[in-house]
Amino acid sequence: MISLMRKCVLLVGVALLALAQSVPAQTGVTAVLPNGRAIHPAGNWIALAPYPFALAVRPDGAEIAAPSIGFPFALNVIANPADPQPSVRRMPAGENSDPAIEVHAGLAYSADGSLLYVATGDSGKIRTYKTSDWTKAAEVSLDGPIPNFSKPAEGSFAATVLASPDGKTLFALDQGNWRIVVLDAAKLERIAEISTGSYPFGLALSPDGARLYVTNTGLFEYTTIPGASEKNPLGTGLHFPPFGYPSKAAREGATVEDKKIPGLGDENSDRGSSLWTYDVRDREHPSATAKLRLGDKIVDASGGTVGGAAPTGVVASDDAVYVSLAHEDQVVRISADGKQVLTSADLSLFSGPRFQDPQGRPLRGVMPSGLALHAGRVYVAESGIDAVGVLDAASMQVVEHIPVGWNPSAVAFSPDGQTLYVVNTKGKGAGPNGGKQHDPNAPSYVGSLEMGSLSAIPLADLPSAAELAQTVLASNTAAIASRPALPHLKHCFLVIRENRTYDEVLGDVTGANGDPSLARFGLDGWAEEQKSATHLKVTPNLHALVAQFAMSDNFYVDSDVSADGHRWVMGINPTPFFNTAWTSGYGGRRKDSAGAAQPGRRALFGGADAPMPEDEPQFGSLWEHIAASGKGLLNYGEGLELEGNAELEGSQPEGQRLFLNSPLPKPVFESTDRRYPTFNLGIPDQFRFTEFERDFRIKLAAGKIPALIVIRLPNDHTADPRPGDGYPYRASYVADNDLALGKIVDFLSKTSIWKDSAFFVTEDDAQGGVDHIDAHRSILLIASPWVKPGTVSHDHTSMGSITRTIDELLGLGPMNLEDALAGEIGGIFDATPHLGPFRLQPSDTRVFNPAAARFAKPKTKKEAAALRDVDDAEEIQKEVEKSASTLRRPSSNN
């Protein structure tokens, strides 16, 4: 069972900024994470607001500032951070964002420490605060004219900021317009700009301030499809993505639906996955001096490299520059002029055949991020294994790995070099967000519960490198246990649904660890919109499937929301860039549009479920893993909701129209039923079942059923009630979903392939409900003739466990560290099959009558928006954080 976390301190606020409060720094913090791994962080633990991605140390070492993105957007200021009793300000103090506090993933102190420069993100400004009293001193917009430069920029997104060593110049990264704006620090005026490559992320200056470096973590610039207009989406948008990636069509363009779709260009050009170097000695006339492509070459061949290296962190010494490659688990040492890679360091601790993929390559998943230099060593945040790697800066040999918190993102040092500071984006997890032990007045939304942290680690107190490595290894392998061999099957089905916790659907299952008082979508459920709508059988089919087959009551999603969830469930660990994008987007501070003039506002803002080329791990996701095996796959609706789309009335059967030349992963492009809808809550899941059955029968008759079949059933996401369309309650969407699920298993269990199949059902995330164990606990059903009937697994499992089990059932090797280090879904499989079919359970027509269900016909813009938003974070947060009397079983049900 996941460990329950102690609540972090929330401070009382006054005026613009909160009062400081002394809080004991914790030591000996331990936790079990949703992915089943453990953390045993070194040093002192200081709680911060959720999702901190950066930090800055004041030059005198007396203070640290760290911005948090999302829930709320906050500025954390820690005074005396190396002391056992640091003083912490969190601004704002509560769980709600304050419009006056704008932050993103970068800030910097002035040379004398009297000012803090803060990049504000979506508003495109650099704002300064006086550190003496934390009042605003001044601000400057990155928008507007710059003398002797091109037309004034608009739509800037201020991502991070650096101060020159002499304190006279600021360099602000504009992710909207893909440029760096040079500012006079004293006057806070724009004086120059320089272009960057695709999706710039990290900035660093050489120690003498003569050179500036930027990492470009993207690959392409996505452009609007010619003739496409968001004013006439049905008539001008594409019905289906234009091409697969990588491919000749993606590079050069193609004619699709009578439209000439522009290509994306060379996936191996230096505009992306690169380090660009600039001469900034003349700050009014900076110039690019080197553009260096990093990482392995992307190839258009099954089983090869498909993802960019995702250059992320960057730091410079006098004679070299160091860059972390998030997708390749490396730090590279580059000549100071930025023109050549000198050497590289492989970071993974995991070696041997057990940690190799089917082609003998090392499993990726260390996910190196932020960097720091100190005393001839490079320190790198290893976001994927909850550690800080330490390298010898000259030889690039790994010296040690230091255990820290969940998802470390940035590292820095005290000026005296004695203390290492690390911000842990997800801290130690969320803990429960419902049930009798949860304070109904406390936050319930996962984004508000998942407090970040600062690890303050005195280097002199660290144990030996061997002991540190053993702690990191043991923590990351905590979920692995010896299990009996699984049967070898021919077909695995993966059904991906939306947003539900375990308790709100299956909390009423006897013999399992559930809270029936939270089971609003169970067999004795209720509709919150109407007090008399009680004793509803919302999910009779899921409950019947659980009784006949197997489930877990100790399964957790790795994700927080749908944006990262649809990546995690396909074996993609989101990059640091993506995590900063979705958190700012879900927090309501990242405006985007397919028709935006700014390339950085058209795509990669974390608002869609489909992986873009920039998301692709080096060797791909589960899609490429299966395709490389030659066993084949089929896709019904998953991974199609690309950036630059609109889900709207009249777009069926596909459910959307597309406005950007965004590609699909090639295996998805080649294996998708193009009549099956993607996410669109105006389309009943009954229609999805009908289309699945139609297409699948054809393939079944032809004997063309592949190894992996992925099915998206999204309507348990819920939306506003539509009584006229057959959805009188939010619970009606869940009941629609349940009936479609039952129909699919009823159909498949009577086919000839059932005896060779396993059927997995899970959610993309658990953000839409509450749970008495953990906000990440969710649903995992396994239906197969080969499971022990009625089994409830209590083993700790996660999304990687599903991938791992599919790998083993199909006779494949592991894909990456996410599945290799995940707990196996063991103890549920049997040596002999149980071949009885599943019998469909009828819906409770009080909550959902399939005969009345129809495509949505929204009458207002608000109704239309409710059907197309894959996640409206504000709406979900309000729903989840309703009073206990609403989310718990009504008194009439007790």
Features from the language model and the residues they span:
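Surface-exposed loop and turn segments in beta-propeller and other repeat-based domains
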Residues: N44, R89-P99, A138-A153, R283-G307, ...
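Blade/loop signatures of beta-propeller domains
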Residues: V23-P41, S464-S475
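Residue-level detector of Asp-centered blade-edge/turn motifs that repeat once per structural unit
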Residues: P59-D60, A111-D112, P165-D166, P207-G209, ...
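Short, conserved, GDST-rich strand-edge loop motifs in beta-rich repeat architectures
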Residues: P67, T215-G272, T425-L449
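Short loop/turn segments immediately following the C-termini of beta-strands
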Residues: I69-G70, G121, Q175, T217-L219, ...
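N-terminal pro-sequences and low-complexity stem/linker regions of secreted or lumenal proteins
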Residues: A465-N894
